[in-house]
Regions:
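Extended, low-polarity transmembrane helix blocks
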Residues: 1-37, 47, 54-63, 67, ...
Length: 144
């Protein structure tokens, strides 16, 4: 049994970081692409939330989601990308999922779920910030 646990730990340490980076990339890269494709609709939604300079904020959002997602996928400055996305998600979560202001019970539950999901994503990104990109990354690659 001890051998199985040791082997599981080795596999998790070797492949966990790249699988985690791939899953984060699968979330943020399509989100950034969607915002490019549907720029005006997303801009209108951001305007409805009372945000100023929505086009500038939307371009920054695209850069963070798409650029950060690609950086995570490749393992290129993954700690910086993870920290940037985590810090970006804090105000995004508070602004776009304020479940405490919603009276309709169903909408409140939905927004609370979205809020907590984002908090979990922030937690995972902070773990990645601390642990780094792992073995299979551009950082770990040896180019000679």
């Amino acid at each position: 049994m001890r051998t199985v646990l040791t082997n599981s730990n080795i596999i998790a340490q070797r492949f966990g970081p790249i699988l985690g980076r791939m899953l984060f990339a699968a979330l943020f890269i399509p989100a950034g692409v969607h915002k490019i494709i549907d720029f005006s609709t997303v801009s209108g939604y951001m305007t409805s939330k009372g945000l100023p300079m929505v086009d500038v904020l939307l371009v920054l959002t695209i850069i963070i989601e798409l650029g950060g997602g690609l950086m995570l996928l490749l393992g290129w400055h993954a700690r910086l990308a993870a920290l940037t996305i985590a810090l970006f998600l804090i105000p995004v979560t508070v602004i776009f999922h304020p479940y405490w202001n919603i009276e309709d019970a169903q909408q409140m539950m939905t927004q609370q779920h979205m809020f907590m999901k984002n908090m979990a994503i922030i937690g995972g990104l902070l773990c990645m910030t601390g642990l780094g990109s792992g073995k299979f990354s551009l950082k770990a690659a040896k180019f000679s």
